[in-house]
Amino acid sequence: CTIDTSEVMDYPPTALSLGESTIQSKGGEIKFPIPIGTYGNFSFIQAPPKSKKTFFVSLLASVYLSGGNNFGGKIRGHREGRCLMHFDTEQGHWHAQRVFKRVQDMSVTKEVGCYKTFALRTVGYKERLKFIEYCLEQNKGKNGMVVIDGVADLVSDVNNLEESNLCVQKIMQLSAKYDCHIITVIHSNFGTDKPTGHLGSFLEKKTETQIQLELNTTNKDWVTVSCKRSRGYAFETFSFSINEFGLPFVVGEIYDPLRYFAPRTLTKTTL
């Protein structure tokens, strides 16, 4: 736990990024990716019900597997041969498999490498986090991005103070211990931009990046993605939609409420 202040430490490597930033150094200009998330940390997505959270998770997961694809715009994955672990806590096996297959369908290659998928609906809430930790331990040294959709199913009640605190502390511990980036999902309180319960409050306080989804005010078929909080540079706001094949895609890296962007049409040749 001791930190040597004289030690030269590198910035945590990036797992997912959107865009680049340039800084001035003694050696000149340095460009670096603006992180959505870095290894050794966790982020979370918050959104109202039925705002396509799982579609957005699929979009991020597919970009991570491929490094970048036609669906993700300027979002980039920095996988470096690591595994993607995808846990669905809510859906039954059929619906969960459909989500996992969507991620593969969006990949630029047929061989996606190490992509491990789990449906935890039948597992009790007390055992879900233990199971996730077990999977990370079994895959030690290979873990990259870990998706937990959604975090509320890891506790009995999002307003249980003790359980919520322990859950977030465990997520912090796992991300650091296994040098992975954990992305999880939680609902927003009705009519507000706050994540639900004590669990949401603890996530806000401890997260590296807080990602907010909102139904787009310009186009009802779009969802706007913004960086509500970040420990580093905030990524630019953008929107995504769902194409005719049921696959999510970025419709514009920068969201301008005064301008109308017609969603680009994806054809079978695009896929």
Q: What are these language model-derived features?
A:
Residues S6-D10, V108, Y233-E236:
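Proline-centered turn/helix-capping motifs that create local helix->coil transitions or kinks
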Residues N69, H78-E162, L166, F245, ...:
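Conserved inter-motif catalytic segment of the P-loop NTP-binding fold
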Residues G37, R76-E80, S107-T109, E137-K140, ...:
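Conserved catalytic network of the ASCE P-loop NTPase/AAA+ motor domain
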Residues F44-Q46, K50-F55, E162-E253:
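Phosphate-binding/switch region of NTP-binding enzymes
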